[in-house]
Swiss-Prot record:
Disulfide bonds: none annotated. Belongs to the jacalin lectin family. It comes from the Eukaryota. Transmembrane segments: none annotated. The keyword Repeat applies. Keywords: Lectin, Repeat, Signal. The keyword Secreted does not apply. This is Jacalin-related lectin 9. One of its GO terms (molecular function) is carbohydrate binding. It comes from Arabidopsis thaliana. Pfam families: Jacalin (PF01419).
Length: 314
């Protein structure tokens, strides 16, 4: 039974050159008429949605997509007649993306109304939903829609979508600019344990045990001279969601440097670690609502100079 399930999933997925699923193709919903169209799944995001409506339903739909940070105009699916055109814009440059679509079609197989939901807002219902059959696409936690397909003739008959994983986001780097830069990247499933070495003036180092495909991967950064304490996260039942701390200019060893002076950690279950180091200077908090920390980056030399994190949806 497990083998059959995997086969069925992959049969509706876009596969990369290494055999990994890049996007899942969701079956088109609506009527059976019209000619099939497919915008594909090779986009980074959706920038704008244009819908042309009339007395008999939605005449056409058009999407502007995002590729390599630039908006790319898409094709019209359907025809343009007398009616109204409405546009729904996604703030893709600031992390907004479509998570689901609700639609309504009538007995003749013509799409009558559509509603788009992003991770930040919901569009108005575009069209006339009353007394029509409703369907939904997407709405999977941690996933986003990055492409559409469907069928259209003299009107829009059906619509489907491509569902892909929401890409990680990178926080700002906080602290000083001394030491060497390092970056663990965002390609981990979660964090299992954090080790912090500190002295009475600053943080010296941080070690992280990551989870990756069922294995523990350890990353070490900084000088391990000092007192070391650890904070464990019960992954996958618990996630690291926040790093709080301070940074300050201290004398180390014979000149002043801007370094991280304290750190503490918070999990999705509300557990908070002790504060490691000494609280002094400027306070910072690295967190993003609805996201877990899946990677760290920073700078370190003799002391721990700066820290940043990667977020991924829980």
């Amino acid at each position: 039974m497990i083998f059959i399930y995997i086969f069925l999933f992959l049969s509706s997925a876009i596969i990369d050159s290494n055999g990994f699923a890049m996007a899942q193709k969701l079956e088109a919903k609506g009527g059976k008429g019209g000619k099939e169209w497919d915008d594909g799944a090779g986009h980074d995001n959706v920038a704008k949605v244009y819908i042309r409506g009339g007395l008999e339903g939605i005449q056409y739909i058009k999407f502007d997509y995002v590729k390599d940070g630039q908006s790319v105009e898409g094709s019209i699916h359907g025809v343009s007649g007398s009616g109204f055109t409405q546009m729904f814009e996604i703030d893709y440059q600031n992390g907004e993306h479509i998570v689901s679509v609700d639609g309504y079609f009538d007995k003749s197989g013509v799409m009558q109304a559509l509603e788009f939901k992003t991770n930040r807002k919901t569009s108005e219902v575009i069209g006339y939903p009353k007394s029509n059959t409703k369907f939904s696409l997407g709405g999977v936690n941690g996933k986003m829609i990055n492409g559409f397909h469907g069928s259209a003739g003299k009107a829009l008959n059906s619509i489907g979508a491509y569902l892909t994983k929401v890409p990680p986001t990178k926080s700002e780097l906080v602290g000083g600019w001394g030491g060497d830069y390092w970056d663990d990247g965002p390609n981990y499933d979660g964090v299992r344990k954090v080790y912090v070495t500190y002295m009475n003036t600053c943080i010296r180092s941080i070690n992280i045990d990551y989870e990756k495909d069922g294995q523990v991967v350890t990353s070490s950064h900084g000088n391990k001279e000092g007192e070391t304490e650890e904070f464990a996260i019960d992954y996958p039942n618990e996630f690291l969601i926040s790093v709080e701390g301070t940074y300050d200019s201290i004398l180390f060893p014979d000149h002043y440097v801007l370094v991280i002076t304290s750190l503490s950690f918070k999990t999705s279950k509300g557990r908070i670690s002790p504060t490691y180091g000494v609280v002094s200077g400027t306070k910072f908090v690295l967190e993003s609502q609805g996201n877990a920390i899946v990677g760290f980056y920073g700078r370190n030399g003799g002391a721990f100079d700066a820290i940043g994190v990667y977020f991924s949806p829980i």
